[in-house]
């Protein structure tokens, strides 16, 4: 049975980097991204400030998916915002509402901590984009121009 819960994401950095992030990269960034190398210094600093959100999806205690996000004061307005960082679930666990449970867990935790909203991003045409289109308001469109080879 899949257990989705808020947890300490720093505990899982090695597992994510060695077991999950490369699968994630190959699925979503294979054409341009270089080798997976989590910026641990950044994650530790964000966590130390109390601004790292991490939801894990676990099967028999093993992490099979995750969603991470950052809390910060909006740079232009007087509110706390939450920015989605990463969302990944191993393909064999993408059944039913598993991915949505990760999203909802982050949203609940962000609201509990006082965030006014969560800004989500998704690859165009992905199933995640479809989920977001049904439950969120489209606000900005992000374009990526590659400047170096991955």
Tell me the role of every PLM-derived stretch.
Residues 1-36:
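Short amphipathic alpha-helix that is part of the acyltransferase structural core
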Residues 44-56:
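A short helix-loop-beta-strand connector motif used in the catalytic cores of GNAT acetyltransferases and
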Residues 56, 62-71:
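Conserved beta-strand in the GNAT
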Residues 73-84:
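A conserved beta-turn-beta hairpin within the catalytic core of GNAT-like acetyltransferases
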Residues 85-95:
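A short, internal acetyl-CoA/4′-phosphopantetheine-binding micro-motif in the GNAT/acyltransferase core
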Residues 118-129:
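Conserved beta-strand-loop-alpha-helix junction that forms the acyl-donor binding cleft
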Residues 121-122, 138-149:
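Conserved catalytic-core motifs of GNAT/GCN5-like acyltransferases
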């Amino acid at each position: 049975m899949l257990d989705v819960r808020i947890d300490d994401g720093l505990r899982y950095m090695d597992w994510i980097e060695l077991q999950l992030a490369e699968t994630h990269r190959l699925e979503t960034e294979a054409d341009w991204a270089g080798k997976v190398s989590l910026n641990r210094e950044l994650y530790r600093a964000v966590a130390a400030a109390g601004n790292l959100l991490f939801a894990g999806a676990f099967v028999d205690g093993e992490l099979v998916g995750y969603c991470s996000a950052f809390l910060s004061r909006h740079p232009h307005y007087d509110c706390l915002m939450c920015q989605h960082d990463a969302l990944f679930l191993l393909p064999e666990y993408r059944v039913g509402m598993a991915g949505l449970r990760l999203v909802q867990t982050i949203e609940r935790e962000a609201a509990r901590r006082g965030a006014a909203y969560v800004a989500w991003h998704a690859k165009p045409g992905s199933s995640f984009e479809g989920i977001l289109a049904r439950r969120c308001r489209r606000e900005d469109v992000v374009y990526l121009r590659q400047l170096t080879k991955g």
